């Protein structure tokens, strides 16, 4: 685990679906967050959020090597299995959709650690969160209520 001045930096990213983004936490507090479309001017930009990542790191005054962790918003194999089962239950109706989505999955989503390393030079482990738990956690942690449920 890398850290700067005993700080824990966690970079969260989402990409290859819609609205790619990055968010940087320092010791559990949000330092910076940005959607890739703010830099590329492409609405709902699904590409790897390299500009958003650079912005977050620059805001904190750190480099990619200072990250303690990098987290991806989804567990690609879990989602891939769910999609496969969905397509199989609707076959052959879903064949066209399946064929359109597979290049994205096979080329990028199933290889997130490699994509992250190639795009950023990050050499640490990539952590994966369960997509719907990530949504629930964002509501939980941002709630102003003293008691939270999800």
Task: Please tell me what each predicted stretch does.
Residues 1-150:
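Short acidic/glycine-rich loops and adjacent helix/strand connectors
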């Amino acid at each position: 685990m890398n850290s700067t001045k005993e700080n824990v930096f966690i970079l969260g990213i989402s990409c290859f679906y819609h609205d790619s983004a990055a968010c940087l936490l320092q010791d559990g507090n949000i330092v910076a967050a940005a959607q890739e479309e703010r830099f590329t001017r492409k609405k709902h930009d699904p590409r790897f959020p390299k500009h958003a990542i650079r912005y977050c790191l620059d805001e904190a005054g750190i480099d990619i090597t200072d990250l303690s962790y990098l987290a991806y918003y989804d567990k690609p194999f879990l989602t891939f299995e769910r999609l496969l089962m969905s397509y199989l239950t609707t076959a052959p109706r879903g064949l066209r959709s399946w064929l359109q989505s597979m290049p994205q999955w096979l080329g990028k989503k199933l290889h997130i650690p490699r994509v992250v390393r190639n795009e950023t030079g990050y050499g640490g482990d990539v952590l994966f969160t369960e997509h719907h738990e990530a949504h629930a956690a964002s509501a939980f942690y941002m709630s102003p209520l003293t008691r939270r449920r999800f």
